[in-house]
Amino acid sequence: MSEGCTGNSCISWHNLDNKLVVSCPLSVVRNFYSLLTLDDVHEVVSKKHLLWNIKRVIEAEVHLSLHNFLRSQAGFPSWPHHLTMARLVARALRLGRSALIQVGAGCGHQGRYRTSFIASALMWHGSVIIVASETIQQRLLKVEIPRLQQWLPANKSIRTGDIWPSPDFQGLLLISPAAWLKGQLAHNNPFPAHIPTIIDGVDDLEDWVRFQLTEAIQPQDWDQLMLAYPYQVELIREAKVQLTHQLFQRPENPYHCYLISQSEIEILHKLYLSLEPNHLPEIWRNFWQKIPNIRDYSLTSPSEFPLFWATIARRQGLFSLYYAPIELSKIIAPIWQRQPVVLIGSALEPETEAPLFRQRLGLDDVTCLKFAADSQGEAIQLYVPYKLPLPNTPEFQGALIHQVRTLVCLSATAPGMTVILIGDVPLKARVGAILASEFGSRVLVEKTCLDENGILISGWEFWRENQSVLPAPRLLIIATLPLPSLENPLVAGRVAHYKRSHQDWFRLYLLPKAMNELQRAIAPVRENQGIVALLDTRVVNRSYGAQILSSLSPLARLNYLDPSLFSTNNEDDAG
């Protein structure tokens, strides 16, 4: 028999005839009563307590164990949805029904929710796979799992690696997204079917999948092709020279990549027809299998149209070729049919059902849940100036630099880091040089070795990848909305795909991408209820602005800037 008491809340359970019998106050029971069916629960007796005979309902056991664990942990990071999430994950494991959970950007950044799904995975009687990045795996192995193992009635084998341990393995396997997807997309999937799988951090799932499906030809692969066809070296070299000539005639862009043109496709196709297919190196065989799909645009359906691009290194005179599908849903939909999955993300979409995310990834029948943010503990202070020029006007850069300098000066004496997010590469360098001339070594461009009151100037990608190792900023300045730039050839290629399909490319692609990026970028500021200055007036001058502002809730709007906003006293008052 097991028992746990917290104040007046006593919970006990024991096995009786292979069934779990639970006794606990109604106040504790109420939280998970709605998840149990009449077949699961038999009310037995008592006015003050309810005695349940539960037929192996894992939700109840997880709820009660985690409830006692959380009450026993002094100073444990509070999150009001621990028990709800643990029950939903446990229910998905029991029923074999997939689920999609949005925990919110603030919670996603802090990672507090992981206690919930780890508890369910440890207490589940069968094998479970957890797909998470290497960094998250280390956090689970060193912190979350040992802490729970000391309390929960579970003794589960835990393994890490890229392959399934053994046919009779009944433990918990931690695996990276790349290794898991590689196995799932392989012709001979090394993972058994029907293994419940929890995927953490699915905000990046689409990028993970597309990366796994990308075929690449690197400069050294041309040497391998020449070795495979010693009598046709000149033919291969001539095709490479033609491609180099055409690619290096393209005007430079900040992204160093270019969509492949029809004439360049013809060069590759002509080379392919001149070679004996049976002797092709594997990497070339895989790559050339895609070329027939893009030779004739008129014969390719919009849903099958791929991205085909090149990156170039001008100084070295080298180029690489890449192919990746745009539409992923049909390719990966079979994965979700092979095993039940629990997908956990931060802020995928404003809607609980995340319809666009599910459509892009072929997710049909899933239980969807979205947790609300803490309206008091996670609220940011948002400043949006009304009179700044729009980003696409000549006056914008000068006005932006003046506004950034004003903000930095106002907060100069306040403790805490300042982060300035600028997506435009030349503008980022210019702002960095101007601020460094005034504030000296406090200013760094995309470096992590900052002082306590340092000023970091960063692009969106650098900030996303490094915010977990940096202190939460007191002030976050955002130059423009992170709408993917149409000047990026890869973005332009995806937009062209939506246009060919007669779809609203802005509301289906650019806007959701920007909203997700924005919420994740702001998440660290919520830790100390800091200030976010959004200097892109499109949020007040465009119809979609209200949708963006709504996605940033909870927030308090600031109509003016004053040094007192950055004072310690003001911070204490806000808390």
Predicted regions located by residue number:
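Conserved Walker A/P-loop ATP-binding site and its immediately adjacent core
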Residues: 100-150
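Conserved RecA-like ASCE ATPase "motif II neighborhood" in helicase/translocase motors
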Residues: 159-196, 206-209, 456-467
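Conserved RecA-like helicase motor-core motifs
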Residues: 132, 149-162, 365-369, 419, ...
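Switch/connector loops and helix/strand junctions flanking conserved nucleotide-binding motifs
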Residues: 138-141, 181-183, 205-208, 350-353, ...
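Conserved RecA-like P-loop NTPase helicase motor core
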Residues: 388-390, 452-542
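Short polybasic linear motifs
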Residues: 25-27
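Structural recognition of the conserved hydrophobic beta-strand(s) that form the central parallel beta-sheet
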Residues: 130-131, 173-176, 196-199, 340-345, ...
